[in-house]
Amino acid sequence: MTRLTRRQALASLASVGAVALAGCTEGAGGGGGDGSGATVPAADARLPLPMEPAELREAAVSGGPDKDGIPSIDDPSFIGASEAGFLADGDPVFGVVRDGVAKAYPQKILAHHEIVNDELAGDPVSVTYCPLTGTVLGFDRGGTTFGVSGRLVNDNLIMYDRATETWWPQILATAVPGPWNAEPEVRSLREFRLVWTTWKRWRDQHPDTRVLSRDTGHPRNYARDPYGDYNPRDGYYAGGAPLFPPLREDDRYGPKRVVMGARAPEGAVAFLKDGLRDAGLLTGQLGDVPVLAVHDPRHDTGYVYRNPDEAAYEAVEGEVQGPSGTTHAPNALPLERVHTFDAMWFAWAGFYPETNVYE
């Protein structure tokens, strides 16, 4: 079967104004930032990188569209669950709850935009999605916004912030040099968890959820994902090789098998999502620290916790029983949680070749 390039996939939607593809030169569209003087909020500690920041710039490739050729949603609007008739029960959504307010971001909309600059409980945030690596991550953005650079590294979206025009590879969540800011401070973004689940699962748990509207200000056919489909799984998402060669290849698992990955300054760890689903609980090691991975059947997702004392926990009918006999929701164990997210195996292994993997 002929592999479809990212440019071809996106160009296939040109008839509905999907993406204006331009000639990609590395300096195109640069300009020293928006003049706001805003600072992107940074994490307390830097996350690990697979190579030197300058080497990551050298490894970056054009994804097809130029800077902002895939337009972020900068003025999102939301509707109620009863108005979201365009979503089928099995369609993926990316969910978050803050201060009692639930929001769902449909994957079929994010596939066309990759970034939504939004607010949660008054806090400015960016919801980011990379279709090629199957990753969704949330970041605090401070007084600026994030945009799509048009470049990829390890097939992963490289974002840029509009205040300083620094490059930020999504999975790494750490600044690297780019054509518009050659010497950024190397620091990591402040993250928050988004849950990759289905519309039905999210709606059942959060009937009052707000849903990102298709009224984005951009002419798009949101019924069509240029890469394939998740409901049922088809096209790029169904399997096969990534569009571009990954930084490193690891054939222990199929390239697009999904892992629940967690990384911290001390290292990275991954749990096969289907293995975690079957087991309910899995133990592993993040650097020198024992960790516990927990499956949450409510959303078919997973959480990873530091468990330095290796306390005994047990999955019991959708909850987790602790050593004292008390039960906890899978997302609320009395342990320190490590930021965890879904990722395609090739992308995780390419960025974190020394990762421990458990199934």
Q: Predicted regions: what is each one?
A:
Residues 1-16:
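N-terminal secretory signal peptides and thylakoid transit peptides that target proteins
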Residues 23-24:
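N-terminal Sec signal peptide cleavage junction
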Residues 29-359:
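Mid-to-C-terminal functional-domain signal that highlights helix-capping/loop sites
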